UniProtKB/Swiss-Prot annotation:
This is E3 ubiquitin-protein ligase BRE1-like 2. It comes from Arabidopsis thaliana. Gene3D superfamilies: 1.20.5.340, Zinc/RING finger domain, C3HC4 (zinc finger). Disruption phenotype: Plants have reduced seed dormancy and several pleiotropic phenotypes, including alterations in leaf color, plant architecture and flower morphology. SUPFAM superfamilies: RING/U-box. Its EC number is 2.3.2.27. The RING-type zinc finger domain mediates binding to an E2 ubiquitin-conjugating enzyme.
Length: 900
């Protein structure tokens, strides 16, 4: 551009150049070269040199030179104005292009955000893994090898390049691509609407079934079906979480690849910076050489030029040589000026690019450090809503468990009362059996009395026939009347005993029915408790998974935002220049088309956002109404359950009143039968047996209590060890968190990325090993607890044997004491010295073989050598771990504690 503009004034005015010598052309050609921004120091030096040479060699009229100079200055001003106008237009076009690109990027981001929102909403609504397949479409899109200003359209059309000559075809293709994308989003919306409708139908069916429930059995069946549905939903959620975890791993691998490419790009940038510094040094050396050459040339010209030749207007004999040298110098200086200007412009552009990159990095760091940015993120809000939902369900299940526990205490009291009454019924049954045997004896006596009565009647008839005495008749009549009265009394008593026996049988049947109902209720209670425990465990596992996913997603988002922006911004200088040239050439052609297309996109985006907001409002209102209806239904169910509980309590009170009346009747019967029971001698024997059995049961109860206390102590010890292991695990988790924070800090430093990642991997592996070792220790402690419980039984058996042996040893001690008394004092002292030496040897054996101070606490499993814990800890800190005794290599898992 600049060379063409500098050649135009030379072609327009040939008559001025003909009247001037070639040296004047050389002088006038230097101001005809326009510069857009500023004139460097080479122009000033060259103009001074040319003026001096021309003043010494050429005698030209001052007026002609002034006119030529004025015209050339005017041309230069015009060209500068034109250049300034062109630059202002280019800047305006660049600003429009950047604003257009920013708006396109924002529209694309909003579109992608809408698609992601729809996918996650479908996941929350209970969609299958088909919803996540839409994410693959976005992941599979690659960056096309085209200009920077055409990347969005190329990615939209999925084409490597665009033909700018046919703008109508480009617009048509863009419209088709937008229609396809709109249709895909509408399909996604339809899929999610279907899933939401299915969920609504499920909820309505559940609510209808709950309304139709009339008995407790139906309620339990419905609750089991609801639990099955909840399990299916939890399985779906787990599958979706696993799929997201797989995607998370893929993205982490891509991020690592981006980090490696970023490190290579930075090394290339450093290499280019070194080359730039070398080129700068070469330019400075060339400038110094030019200055020295100019000084030498000035000195040579002053020595060779003479004054008379200048006065007469003739030239010196060395003029052609000076002209050629001047032309060569001028050409070389022009080339050097062009190279210097190009290098300076490249350096300025690279500096501006680096400044923009540093600003973007600072903005990214500020956004990442800002907590509000994290709290306002979409993923954080979704996870927070999910956590609130699970917390609400937790509270609901806690309330249910508390109500069940309250009912449990009531049921336990009722169970105790029924057990007491059952025992009293058993005692009454025993008494009724004894009374029944007594009744049978009395019936036999009655039959014998009836036989005697018949015999007496026959005898009286015979006596009446034999004798006619009135006294004997009266006596026999009195005897018969007394016998009849006694018979009636005995029959009345028999009827009473039969009625009491029937009542006792009826009470026994009622007690059995109550026991069956109690057992059924206890089974139901256990089932509900198991279900509650399972649901609590599932909730805890889901919470732990959610927390892990939160942490990993936050780290991945930070890394992805850093890497993607740095990788997208790392372009070469040549690509940027090519893209700028193409953008300047295509700006005028695409301006009108892009403005219209941009207006259409804006209108469509506004309509779509309005429709999406209205749909979200409608869905939110529908969800609120559904939740309100569910609340009303739950309140009604609670009221119905309370009424049923009240009815059951009233029935229980009525049954208790009936039992009390029966007990009172039974007590009345006992008062009536006390006279008969006093005559029974077997009662005393039975009481003696009961006393002996009660003594035996008390003794067994005391033994069970002692065993229970021992087991509780062992459980406390095991719980203490488990708590210690939990504390170690928490400490290890804190160490893991610290390692992650250090790794995140080290990621920001580009030089130490690989080292920091390797160290964190090793630390994580060690922590996993320690965690596994702790798990194995917990399992071993559980096994030890089982072994201890077995050993206690063996020890109890051994105690009896030891007691017997103790008696034998005591007898032997008595004999030995007698022998020692017989022995002298010298032999006793010698034996004491020997025993002391043996004790010292035993103590030395129990001490560590490295330090000889501390006792042996740790064993190495490979060689079974014993040492103290501190000496082994020192060897564990060393990388090459060897046994101090035999030199065999061992690992951290080969060291075990030993109780001496």
């Amino acid at each position: 551009m600049e060379n063409q503009e500098s050649d135009e004034p030379m072609q327009k005015k040939p008559h001025l150049l003909d009247s001037v010598s070639p040296n004047s052309m050389a002088r006038n050609s230097s101001p005809s070269h326009p510069i857009a921004k500023s004139v460097s120091f080479f122009d000033c030096d060259f103009s001074l040199l040319c003026l001096r040479l021309v003043d010494y060699e050429i005698d030209v009229d001052a007026t002609v030179l002034q006119l030529q100079n004025q015209k050339l200055v005017q041309q230069l001003d015009l060209q500068k104005k034109q250049l300034y106008d062109v630059e202002s237009k280019i800047q305006e076009l660049q600003l429009n292009q950047t604003s257009y690109d920013d708006e396109l990027i924002s529209v694309n981001q909003l579109w992608n955000q809408l698609v992601d929102d729809l996918i996650l909403l479908g996941v929350r609504a209970g969609a299958n893994q088909e919803a996540l397949n839409y994410l693959d479409i976005v992941d599979k899109k690659r960056v096309p090898p085209c200009a920077a200003d055409e990347t969005f359209l190329c990615r939209l059309l999925q084409v490597d390049s665009l033909d700018t000559s046919k703008s109508d075809e480009v617009v048509r293709k863009v419209e088709e691509a937008l229609a396809l994308r709109h249709s895909s989003t509408m399909e996604l919306m339809g899929l999610f609407e279907n899933t939401i409708d299915t969920q609504k139908t499920k909820a309505e069916s559940i609510s209808q079934s709950l309304h139709a429930v009339k008995s407790t059995e139906d309620a339990t069946i419905q609750l089991s079906s609801i639990n099955d549905l909840m399990k299916e939903e939890s399985k779906n959620l787990r599958e979706m979480i696993d799929a997201l975890h797989v995607r998370h791993k893929e993205h982490s691998e891509q991020i690592q690849a981006y980090i490696s490419s970023h490190s290579t790009d930075q090394s290339e940038l450093k290499h280019l910076k070194g080359q730039l510094e070398e080129i700068k040094a070469e330019l400075e050396e060339n400038r110094r050489k030019l200055i020295t050459l100019k000084m030498q040339k000035d000195a040579a010209c002053e020595g060779h030029v003479t004054s008379p030749a200048i006065a007469n207007g003739s030239l010196s004999p060395e003029k052609p040589v000076d002209k050629t040298k001047l032309r060569e110098l001028k050409d070389s200086i022009d080339e050097i000026k062009i190279m210097a200007e190009g290098r300076l412009s490249e350096l300025q552009a690279s500096q501006e690019y680096n400044l923009s990159l540093s600003r973007q990095c600072q903005d990214i760091e500020n956004e990442l450090k800002d907590d509000q940015y994290i709290y306002s993120s979409r993923l954080y809000s979704l996870i927070n809503d999910r956590i609130h939902h699970w917390n609400a369900e937790l509270d609901r299940y806690k309330i249910l468990t508390e109500a069940i526990q309250a009912e449990r205490s009531f049921v336990m009291r009722r169970d105790k009362e029924l057990n007491l009454r059952a025992e009293s019924l058993e005692a009454a049954n025993h008494k009724t059996t004894t009374v029944g045997s007594r009744i049978e004896v009395l019936e036999k006596k009655l039959q014998s009395c009836i036989i005697e009565k018949n015999g007496l009647e026959l005898e009286t008839e015979e006596a009446i026939q034999d004798s006619e005495r009135q006294d004997i008749k009266s006596e026999f009549i009195a005897m018969a009347s007394t016998l009849s009265k006694e018979m009636e009394m005995m029959e009345a008593q028999l009827k009473r005993w039969k009625d009491t026996a029937q009542d006792a049988l009826y009470l026994r049947e009622q007690a059995q029915s109550l026991r069956v109902s109690l057992s059924n209720k206890a089974d139901e209670q256990k089932g509900l408790e198991d279900k509650c425990a399972k649901q609590m465990a599932e909730i805890k596992s889901l919470k732990a998974l959610i927390e892990k996913l939160l942490k990993e997603k936050l780290q991945l988002q930070n890394l992805a935002s850093i890497c993607t922006r740095e990788c997208n911004d790392d372009r070469g200088l040549a690509e940027i220049k090519d893209s700028q040239r193409k953008a300047q050439a295509q700006a005028e052609e695409l301006k009108n088309v892009l403005d219209e297309h941009f207006l259409e996109l804006r209108v469509k985006a506004a309509h779509e956002t309005e429709s999406a907001c209205q749909e979200r409002l409608a869905t939110a209102k529908a969800e609120i109404a559904e939740l309100r209806t569910q609340l009303d239904l739950s309140e009604r169910e609670v009221l119905e359950l309370k009424e049923g509980i009240k009815v059951k309590e009233q029935e229980a009170e009525a049954s208790i009143a009936e039992m009390e009346t029966i007990g009172q009747a039974y007590e009345d019967m006992q008062t009536q039968n006390q006279h008969l029971l006093q005559q029974v001698a077997e009662r005393d024997d039975y009481n003696i047996k009961l006393v002996s059995e009660s003594v035996k049961t008390k003794h067994a109860y005391n033994t069970h209590l002692s065993e229970k206390q021992v087991m509780e102590k062992q459980l406390h010890q095991v719980n203490a060890s488990v708590e210690n292991f939990k504390a170690r695990i928490a400490h290890n988790e804190e160490q893991m968190k610290g390692c992650f924070s250090e790794a995140y800090k080290l990621i920001q430093e580009d030089r130490h990325l690989v080292i920091s990642l390797e160290t964190t991997k090793w630390e994580v592996a060690d922590a996993d090993k320690e965690f596994r070792w702790l798990k194995s220790a917990v399992s071993s402690s559980e096994k030890e607890y089982e072994q201890i419980s077995r050993r206690t039984d063996d020890i109890k058996l051994e105690l009896d044997d030891e007691r017997r042996e103790k008696k034998k040893l005591e007898e032997e001690l008595m004999e030995l004491n007698k022998e020692l008394e017989e022995l002298g004092s010298e032999s006793v002292e010698a034996a004491i010295v020997r025993l002391q030496e043996e004790v010292k040897n035993c103590k030395n054996i129990l001490k560590c073989g490295v330090c000889f101070d501390r006792p042996k606490e740790v064993v190495i499993v490979k060689c079974y050598h014993l040492f103290c814990q501190q000496c082994i800890q020192r060897s564990l800190e060393i990388r090459h771990r060897k046994c101090p005794g035999c030199g065999t290599a061992f690992g951290q898992n080969d060291v075990r504690l030993v109780k001496m």
